[in-house]
Amino acid sequence: MKQATPIGDAAVNFIATTPARKHTPEVLDAAKMCLVDWFGVALGAVNAPAAQAVRRVALSWGPTGKAHMLFGPAVTPAAAALANGTMAHCMDYDDTHLDGAGHISGPTWAVALALAEEHGKTEQEALAAFITGFEISARLGAGGFGRKLQYNGFHPSSIFGRFSAAATAAVLLGLDRTQIAYALGVAGTTVGGLNGSFGTMSKPFHLGKAAMDGLLAADLARAGFESATHLLDAENGLSGTLVQDGSVKLAPEPFTDGLALLRNAYKPYACCKATHACVDAARKLSARVTPGLIQRIVLGASPMTLAVAAKPNPQTPLEGKFSVAYCAALGLSGYAAVEGDFSDTRLRDPDVRALIAKSEIAVQPGTELTEGFVEVHLTDGKTLRADVPLALGNPGNPMSWTGMEAKFAGLVEPVLGDETRPLFEALRRFETPGTLAKVMAMVTRTT
């Protein structure tokens, strides 16, 4: 029987062979959908308190480069990656890879764009580097490993985001195989991010810090810095340390069965993905119920929903994004659960608060976070129920380009106005030479 290639060696080989890979139009289209989504959620968060704070700190560091903060000046690539990576996750509205790695595009595109600007790389090179970084993160988080980390209290997006960022940077910096191995080692020894931070500014910071740490790892490797090269395989490495009972390990041969990018998911709602099935179900029921006549609400949800999105009494808009009761209450009240619905005004709406108080979570063992139901018990004794076997935005029930354009417009028009449509069209044709400079010129004016 053929002996499995060590995971670390397979990852290094996958990164090193990036220039030789030719991607199909389908794959490039998927990468560009990630890019459009990334710009939409990042630009929409330009005034978010977390984004503003991180930008102020990064700007205070002083040294400049050629990489731009969104709506800001040219700074070092590390500073741009930190600021832009944080912005991309401030609204918790960014794409999600449900195999276990979480929000991959946030740190990955932040690094790809920063280094492409800094080093004059082409749009095609940036796309190729992003795809490689995305695959590294998605494959390391697959096989139940990422989900196990989440149950253990770790934020997979933060952990695997460092590897996607390091891989993307390694490609754009032209690292050799030895340097790539060291870069992955440095990225691995910096992993972190706790689920206990969900509902606070620290959660989006996880992704900005992952972007910066991954880029730093590659920069250090290029400068001759050496690190452990066995962290993806050794018992005292990534899986053995973070899952100490050995119940789940990194999947062997993780780069041999097509591209995980084609299984990415996108959010129609500006809240934790684990709430979306219940939002879908609630919106189905909204036209059939009068909120004031609801006596009791049962939310059928996955164990993961209970683990990460079950805040029973949210007090801030950020907490609301991780409260399936609040998100379902929005849906039942006829709201679309877009970013504007996660506001202090909406959160304090007495009718919405009344629905939250009437809600209870019924965990459905063995179900995925993409499925759920809402059951409404009315004061007249009637019961209404809507089941959602697969929430909108996931593979099998995907978001269309039309849906993505509507999401993008809703986020960007308040910021860019008439420039929104030209920006969208430019991103859709991102592989065209000269597009990167054109795009960044549109989104780097100061506000």
Predicted features and spans:
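Buried hydrophobic packing segments
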Residues: 39, 108-115, 130-137, 162-170, ...
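Terminal-appendage/accessory-domain detector
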Residues: 1-102, 195-212, 219-447
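Function-dense linear segments that define catalytic or interfacial modules
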Residues: 82-95, 104-122, 129, 136, ...
